[in-house]
């Protein structure tokens, strides 16, 4: 069972009751606090599109505390972040691993942050296949293409050479917030607003 806090806001027309995520959305804040899957991707994409329609010139702030998840779902979020007119500022709180780190690095240049004790982890995509040998071969070729595409995007977002990214994502590669800044996944470590 998921517990969602509610906040009460005083307005000129009385009190208004919001779930916390709706209230944050009002301030152009999106919180990704779980695994990246089709459901969370649909919610984040919808919020990005909504906030762009509200004001295409104001930044959106995407807070990330995620262990990662599905590549296709993460790419749906990433592509939407690049597609909309608003700058999307990304802030890692806690953990941004795998697709969470990919989304963190995909924020607007100069607006990618992590809190001091956050942890960031990059690695190659994983998957599995079953069936006939031909089907397994097709799946293996597809995941290698996906790995190449993800590494190309990370290289572009970090300024690192493709070969460096490819080597550094062969295994789980954990970084502190400061190490992630030095690597180019984020622009700076922040301690306060």
UniProtKB/Swiss-Prot annotation:
GO annotation, cellular component aspect: cytoplasm; endopeptidase Clp complex
Keyword line: Cytoplasm, Hydrolase, Protease, Serine protease
Any one GO MF annotation of this record: ATP-dependent peptidase activity
Transmembrane segments: none
First-level EC class: hydrolase
Chief location category: cytoplasm
A Pfam family hit: CLP_protease
Catalysed reactions listed for this entry: Hydrolysis of proteins to small peptides in the presence of ATP and magnesium. alpha-casein is the usual test substrate. In the absence of ATP, only oligopeptides shorter than five residues are hydrolyzed (such as succinyl-Leu-Tyr-|-NHMec, and Leu-Tyr-Leu-|-Tyr-Trp, in which cleavage of the -Tyr-|-Leu- and -Tyr-|-Trp bonds also occurs)
NCBIfam families, alphabetized: clpP, PRK00277.1, PRK12553.1
Function: Cleaves peptides in various proteins in a process that requires ATP hydrolysis. Has a chymotrypsin-like activity. Plays a major role in the degradation of misfolded proteins.
Protein name, as recorded: ATP-dependent Clp protease proteolytic subunit
Species annotation: Agathobacter rectalis (strain ATCC 33656 / DSM 3377 / JCM 17463 / KCTC 5835 / VPI 0990)
Lineage: Bacteria, Bacillati, Bacillota, Clostridia, Lachnospirales
Gene: clpP
